[in-house]
Amino acid sequence: LGVLAFALELTACAGSPETLPPCDPAQEEAGLAFCDLRNPEDLALLPGHAWIVVSQMARLDADANAEADPASARPGDLLAIRLADGARRRLFPPNAADPDTPWPPPPSEERWGDGACPGPPDPARFLPHGIDVGSDHRGRARLAVVNHGGREAVEIFEIGARTAPSLEWRGCVPMPEGMMMNDVAWHPAGGFVVTNFSPPLEGRGLGTLWTGFEIMTGRETGSVLRWTPDAGLVEIGNSRGSAPNGVAVAPDGSEIFVAEWGAKSIFRLRFDGDGEPLRDAVALEHSPDNLSWTRDGRLLVAGQGGGMLKVLGCNEIEEGACGIDYGVYAIDPVSLEARRLFDGKGAASVALEVDDEVLVGSFVGDRIERRTAPGRSVGSPGAQPAESAD
């Protein structure tokens, strides 16, 4: 009865929070935002740092199930934005008229990822989430994408750079049944790490409501897994947590940082020898989402305020942006000291340093905010994305 009462309360309380009006083109002209976007949930710099790649995450109706009814969700996409002038190029699903991105991809002798990958994703069902840019030991740039559409998998693309960025699908790593992944990060020693946020959230059934209860009360719902070509997917010891969300790997691979959304904390796993990693954490005032590195080797994290009920309510918003509060933090990876850089409204899910700006994306919104980095610059030249050994 207690669970049933909670389920009824959760369903009733997940109302719509404040709605921000649609992004004004004048904001884009003034260099304050990139407008006319669709849920820019995660961002990453592309090689050369002239463009960013944006994961535009589709939103499901609260009662829809994309697996059972693909038509219930409009597919998401991967978009490139040129920072200098805001020019845009859709990277995936490919444009049928674009000769640089033929689809289906031509047969290739070299496939990346798991040999059990059944083939390319269905563009009509593509639902991207967390992303990460890296390079392999041969210097080939690549993009990892968590995809929920048609299958739960990490899709792997090779990044091309002709006159503008392009993507070539190279393979995938299917995820186990009963898991809903959130974010992915390349590992410098090979493969990647990926967060298992929770069991799949489908509609407003009792399973979803129970998972929501577990997250709201800080109970464990998921963990972090590492994939390598040799060992496959393995859960990392000491990594279980409440709604593991964003993830980042230290450039030397000795530490992994995880945004524990349900616990409002960032935890660090330190690897020293063959035993379980050591774990410590720093508490935040917001529920942390995606992580990114600054040039001076600190972590940026955007987090939402208001808790799970407010976040669920964001799904009812049809235009503009969800107006829940957010905070952006810089975290020292050595001391785990967290410094709050700025606050705002707009359901922020990622903060990315670009020159003297911090770009802020949203999981329910139509814009990327362009904020001046506090103190003129968040970082100084230094850390760069790590190469991977595979």
Region roles according to the model:
Residues 16-39, 112-116, 167, 336-339:
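A short helix->beta-strand "capping" segment at the edge of beta-propeller domains
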Residues 37-47, 74, 97-135, 169, ...:
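Beta-rich, blade/repeat-based domains predominating
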Residues 32-76, 347-350:
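Beta-strand-rich domains and repeat architectures in extracellular enzymes and scaffolds
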Residues 74-84, 155-161, 215-228, 320-333:
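Beta-propeller blade signature
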Residues 54-75, 145-146, 194-218, 302-323:
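Short, conserved, GDST-rich strand-edge loop motifs in beta-rich repeat architectures
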Residues 348-390:
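Blade-level signature of beta-propeller repeat domains, shared across WD40, Kelch, NHL, RCC1
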Residues 285-339:
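Loop/turn-rich, solvent-exposed surfaces of beta-rich toroidal or solenoidal domains
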Residues 157-165, 269-274, 372-378:
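Short loop/turn segments immediately following beta-strands, especially the blade-tip
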